Each structure stands twice: as C-alpha cells, then as structure tokens.
Amino acid sequence: MFNNLQDKLDSAFKNLKGQGRITELNVATTVKEIRRALVDADVNYKIAKEFTDKIKDKAVGEKVLNAISPGQLMVKIVKDELTELMGGEEVPLNTKGSPAVILIAGLQGSGKTTFSGKLANYLKTKKGLNPLLVAADIYRPAAMEQLRVLAEQIGVDVHIEAENKDAVSIARSAVASAKSKNKNVVIIDTAGRLAIDELMMTEVANIKNAVTPQEILFVVDSMTGQDAVNTAKAFNDRLDFTGVILTKLDGDTRGGAAISIKYTVNKPIKFVSNGEKMDALDVFYPERMAQRILGMGDITSLVERAQQQFDEEQAKKIESKIRKNKFDFADFKAQLEMIKKMGNMKDLLGMIPGVGKQIKDLDISDDSFKGIEAIIDSMTPEERSNPDLINGNRRKRISNGCGKDIAEVNAFMKQFEQMRDMMKNMNKMGAFGKMMPGGGIGGIKRP
C-alpha cells in the first residue's frame, strides 16, 4: 500500500540525515521533495502546496532535542499534518434509527455492491446489529444476484424485487419490511454508472427523499486517484453525502485519493476496503493511515485484528502447552488458521513498523502458507501431536504425501524446532505474559 509514495518521502527525509539542526535551507529542500512526491502520488497541486507550506512554517525554527534528529522531527511534523489533512479523528457510522437507513452510491466498478455486503457483515459481527441488504440496482440483474450471494455468504437477509423497475418503490418497501421484521439497519445498494450523470443523480436524490437515510456513503476506487476525488466532489455538490468509502486500497501504490478527498469534499472517510473477503473492511483512522503512508506501521490495528480473531480459551490452552514445551503441529496449524482470518497477509505484515518497505517487492499472497498446511496435513494425527516421532522415513512419506521436496519438509521441521526452542527460552524469561493472545507464530518461512 502506497509503496511509491513511501519511497519518495523516505528520500525526502534523507536530506536532513546527519544535519545538526533544522534550517530554512534544508527545510526548503525537503519540503520541495515532499511536494513533488505528493503530486506524483496524484494529489492535487493546490492541496500539496498548502500542505507543504504548513510543514515549512512548523519546521523552520523548531528546536531539535538531543533525543531526536532533525529527520525524526520532520517525520513527526509530516505525520501530524497528514493526520489533520485526512480528517484528524475517526468519524463513527450513524446507526441510530428505527431502522437506520444507509444509502450506498458510487460509480459502476467501484466495489459498491461488495462494500454493501462487507458493511452488513461488519454491522452484524462487530456491532451486533441485524441488517437488511437491499438490491436497488434495477438496471443490472447481475448486481441483484451478487448481493443475494453475498447475503447468503454472511448470513443476513436480502430484499430483492426482480420485476420492480422503480428503485424508489423498492427502497420504500424494503424499509417497511425491515420495520416489520425488527431489522435495525437497512443498507440500500443503488445503481452505478460509468460516469456521474443526471439520471443517476436524480434517482439517488429521489431515494434519499423517500427514505431519509442516516448515512449516504459514496464509494470510490482509490486506484483512480484524482479522478476519484473529482467524482466525489461532483456527487457531493449535488447530493451532500455523509461519508466516503475507499475501496481497492491494497492495490493503490500512490495514495492520492486517501490524502486528497477529505480536503476536497470536507466529508470524512469512514471505511477502507482491501480485497474481496467479507471481513476485509477497516474503520478509517487518519492517524493510523498517516503512519502507514510514512512506513511507520500500524501496530494498533494489527493487535485489534488479532484480538477479534483469536479465541481466548484456545489461546490459554496453547499458552499452557507452550509453558510445558508441548506445542505441536496441530497447535501450529490452529494458530495459522486464526492468522489467515485476520486478513491479507501482505497487508498484515505492512502493519509492522519497518517491514512494509522490506516486503514491497515480494510475492506474498493469501496462499502463502498453503505449503506449510500441506506438510502438516500429510502427517498422521499421532505425528501432529508428537513432533519428536518424525524420523527420516516419516519425513519421506510426508514429502510424498504433500508433493513437496524432502528438502522443503526438512527445512520446515528445522524451523519448527527452532521456534519451539525460542518459545522454551521465552518461557524461561516469563515473556509469554506480555504477548498478544495465542502467543503468535514467528520465524517460520513458507515452503
């Protein structure tokens, strides 16, 4: 995420490396490169200029404490200003209503229908609400079918009137149905267009007037950069939405939309969406995003995801086995499954400070650990629960069973033993009481 921008900002900060203090000259040079990096990231020049002028004003004359370098001080100033530019603080979704109505709008292909499903899943699993999805795209039967499939996948009800060609009528009857079924949130997926046009605007405006939504969320594809910002502005000028959703952020190497959109439309970014999985949706926190743009990681979000996925009872059970030095392959695979549920692997690793830059060119997919799983699945139950049983002959059989070279199996076994030794040493030092639930998995490379 935002790798190109990260690299260019890093290069800009290097101007201050080795400098004893901040001066007008070295600030001017650094600020010029930051501005160029932002413009290259598809940030509007006016926004980039105003942003860097603020940085310059704050940086010039700042006293550098002995504990930090001029470069570190500049990074902090840029982080604070980026945070402010993107909204300053999280703005929660308004779900007050009987039921609360959330209208989803956006261009065709922006990820609008997928986001509708993700939002329903988020409200059901994270907020304990009972949502109803509504298919109000009367022009694309495929969109109705997609929403039906997503609703079935996440276990929520969906309102579809396939023969009704009046989107306003569908929205009205869906809200009435939600009231009768004690649904507390209605999510209406409206029709998209290839471009903003009068028909689209009028239809969404009519739905808005008919059902008085608590939220109107405009979904934009972050990979379209400044085009996304311009589209959001045109839509907001006409319909005054309440928040922005950025989709496909995992494929955005530039970051122009995330940085510019709040400034341009003066509406908060409420969620960011990564990938196709229904749980791949994050609340937007400006400060955390600023940290990620600057390559500082996002440990807070990483820990939150871990806490959501790790089962406390299972964590205690595994910790007990670690303390007794009885951690086995079955435990390892169980932990692996929980980590996979946390989201896109490359995205997760990018939340660790300093790691994002190191892995940017690596091919790390959600299938990264399939080789490890294949090796473990080729073991007998007895072998999984007793790693010490696995001798040379058993390794050959496991290699044949999983289709992996014997060298890969041996390498995994060696790494597993090293990890168990590390756990044993950490146990002696009492380190496990300070770790996140389940102890985590460290040191294992994918075969």
Where are the predicted features?
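Residue-level signature of catalytic and energy-coupling elements of molecular machines
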Residues: L16, D42, V78, L107, ...
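Short, glycine/polar-rich helix-capping loops at beta-to-alpha or helix-loop-helix junctions
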Residues: P141-L147, A228-T231
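Structured core elements
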Residues: V101-L103, L132-L133, H159, I187, ...
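Alpha-helical transmembrane segments of polytopic integral membrane proteins
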Residues: N184, I188, V204, M342-M345
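Long amphipathic alpha-helical segments used for membrane anchoring, targeting, substrate engagement
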Residues: F2-Q19, R288-P447
